[in-house]
């Protein structure tokens, strides 16, 4: 600011004195107005106009991805496509991330209060609310730091937003906006619902209280896959229009579904792998009685669908080459056995890939630019890692009905707001029996069923409003601040801390933007146009 002071000379006029004060007042005013403007940090906006089309349960994928010219940062936005052990991620939640390519970020962690008194839980999120699904449905209330009971849905307690309505996937029953669209069958059970690509999919299983066995006749029992055409407004599901596939083994069901492009896939609990496309089911892998091969999670990652597998504990890739093992994804710690491992959960958080692995409660982190796996943390502090046993507490638990009951699961990886929430469990989320399991006294059992809130700088997520036709999403950068706006209304904002924040404030110019591409897989809506405003 240039401050000009004019003194009225002896004998000077009142008018000249008044002029001097006017100059002074104007100078002060200009400093108040111009000061903040001069200090304001530049704004960069990624403006995306997109039409998601009719909501048929599809995944919407990537909106854009871009790197800075010096290669220090990668930025992107999109809708994650993931399914973790019978629970699907929120398709309507949009993520905005900043990922340093070389600078390290510290993963902070806090433990939330326990949602139940069981040795496990599974989490799910909808509309940026976090729910615990075991021991009664409960919603996390961050302001009050407590879990609040919710009315149960039944089954896996799964709900999903479809258009402006809510689809409830209950215990053999499906409802849309409270109205039943599929009732329980007269014989057997409908299990593991999945809605995608305008198809309500599920397993119809008739076991007749007998173990797995090869199919002989419908009277003896069966497992059958269904894909039922349905969109909001159709009313009840018409089973006569369903596309079905009778499976080779009675009792087959699933832990994981997935959707990639125009395909729906599911892996059965005894190794069968099946695909629906263009109105037809087909078998890609035969089930094998007595041979373990189970898929527990699915997630879009660039142009692949990654699926977490047991007993390797690795990710398998479904791409144009079929379903194939990815050695070292993730690796095995040298201190533990490489047997009976399970990649149960997968997610994208802050632009990186995270995987939860049984039986030692490992949380692995993969950096896409460095192509590097890191053991982010172990979600249990006991017992010590050992390659002399396969599961924790194998020796102490010997003789009990389930020998590997105290293996350590990472049951959920769920993103909400700026955070990643991870939950733990024993093999079964049972109640602790101090007489049967005294080795977990007095409070070791409480490590099972914990919910951990993890934070890595550079992640922001928000629930988007459903629109018919085009909607505008804007992803803003100002200094170290991230902001998401939909049709002029702010959805969320955060400030990126640490080294990532400093890089963001001093970022280099941007390389050309890749629209409709990125870590969340190809864009899955009807249309998208983008521009960068600076």
List each model region and its residues.
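Carbohydrate-binding surfaces in secreted/extracellular proteins
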Residues: 466-497
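Flexible glycan-contacting loops in extracellular carbohydrate-active proteins
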Residues: 390, 494-527
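Extracellular/lumenal carbohydrate-interaction signature centered on repeated Trp-anchored short motifs
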Residues: 462-469, 522-526
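Boundary at the C-terminal end of the N-terminal hydrophobic targeting segment
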Residues: 34-40
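Bacterial N-terminal signal peptides
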Residues: 21-33
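N-terminal secretory signal peptides that target proteins for export/translocation
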Residues: 1-18
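Residue-level marker for isolated small/hydroxyl-bearing positions within beta-strands
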Residues: 76-78, 132-134, 168-170, 202-205, ...
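Trp- and S/T/G-rich repeat-edge/linker motifs of beta-rich repeat architectures
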Residues: 40-62, 82-118, 125-200, 207-255, ...
